[in-house]
Amino acid sequence: DQYIPYRDLFGGVLNEFHLFDRLYGLPEVDEAGLNQWLRIMQLDHKTSFVDGRFTNIDLSTGQKARLALIIALLEDKPVYVLDEWAAPQDPEFRQYFYEVILADLKEAGKTVFVVSHDDRYYHIPDRILKMEYGQVVDIETAS
């Protein structure tokens, strides 16, 4: 087969997601690598990953979204879709996400679709797709 099923290409965090203290559906997970992601996402003071479990998942909405993103990134997909992911983040982490994390994902060769209404960061993406009523009405390319 020369075609890859589309589900193998995409990962993401959509508006509704569920967290569990264990990881399901992932092959062997490197605890040190996962704990490094917790540091990057500024969650290492709230939880850690020990013996195949998160020590705490009683987190704020923004922190839960960060943990969900870490889990999605562990799948190592080439394309990610993040639906209003940054909305529940505090202002400092939201800026860090747009300016650092997205740049790191781009450098790693990942394609990331970020659904956002936050125009403070519209200068960051390579392209902006404007949509109205579910239809693309304009595509802007970074200058």
Please report, for each region that a protein language model flagged, where it lies by residue.
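ABC nucleotide-binding domain signature
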Residues: I4-N15, F113
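Conserved hydrophobic alpha-helix in the ABC-type ATPase nucleotide-binding domain
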Residues: Y6, Y96-I101
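Conserved ABC ATPase signature
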Residues: R53-Q63
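GG-anchored amphipathic helix commonly corresponding to the ABC/SMC/Rad50 NBD signature/C-loop
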Residues: T61-L82, Y96-Y98
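Walker B catalytic motif
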Residues: L82-D90
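Conserved catalytic loops of ABC-family nucleotide-binding domains
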Residues: I101-D118, Y122
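H-loop (His-switch) and adjacent beta-strand-loop-beta switch element
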Residues: H117, I124-A142
